[in-house]
Amino acid sequence: MGYKSILVHLDTSDRAHARLELALRLARRFDAHLTALSAIYTPEPVSFYVMAGSADYFREQRERRDERVAALERLFHAETTRAKVSADWIAADARANTVVPRHARHADLVIVGQSDPNDPETYIDDQFPENLVLSAGRPVLFVPYAGDHASLGERVLVAWDGSREAVRAAHDAMPFIEHAKRTTVVAVGNGNDPDANVRIPGADAALMLARHASDVNVLDIECGPGASIGDTLLSRAYETGTDLLVMGAYGHARWRELVMGGVTRTVLASMTLPVLMSH
């Protein structure tokens, strides 16, 4: 089992090259076809026409970004040729929230970057990460804006709550889990889950995964006072040297998580390791 078609989203941020390198490593590992999708945020021109000289500013910004995209395309073709990876390049013809999910549905795995508050080029579209993971129907691998993550997939942490989303994520991550040196199923409790008695226990999930992987263990932990499940997961991942976190996304109603926060948003904002999410 493996990913035979990988889609990587590339933008004009400083981390685009590192994301491409990671995608190339995975394409070689799984003998997969690699598609790069260039999609960047471009403001509507009408928003610039309210002030004198703003139209010229918009034109200059667009030309500068077009130059960076062209350079990125040349780099992509050079790197895939060097790595002998089957590849193609797609330039988005619409807003990212429309075009990226559409192309993602043709892939086995989608790779995108984490938003960096210090790099405006990582802003792609309104709530882009949330929209993608909810609408793509494919596993999305979010890559942090720091680090090279060379060991990705050797030590996997599966966040488990017995939900449909958790089951989907675990199975979507199976190509990683099958070759991992260690897989840990971690169930984080906070004592406030009304459906806990009907969810699949972590031990049962570990037993299922053990039929695919060589070293699987299970860990049940409780959130400390005032701690969130998302922060607890990230802390445990750091403490155990995990290099891939696998989790279901938006198990609660999306409006509730977007308004009140939640595990998904906490992890997307604070992650320091790659995170594979499925909905």
Q: Each predicted region: which residue ranges?
A:
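Small/aliphatic-rich secondary-structure junction motif
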Residues: 1-56, 135, 152-221
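Amphipathic coiled-coil/heptad-repeat helices and related helical stalk/stem segments
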Residues: 19, 96, 125, 166-169, ...
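P-loop/Walker A phosphate-binding loop and immediately adjacent motor/lid segment at beta-alpha junctions
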Residues: 74-82, 120-144, 206, 210-219
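A short acidic, glycine-rich active-site loop
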Residues: 56-71
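Structural beta-alpha unit
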Residues: 1, 41, 77-110, 211-245, ...
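A structural preference for short, hydrophobic beta-strand core positions in alpha/beta folds
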Residues: 36, 88-91, 142, 185, ...
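Gly/Ser-rich helix-loop-strand patches that form or flank binding pockets
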Residues: 20, 25-29, 99-148, 236-279
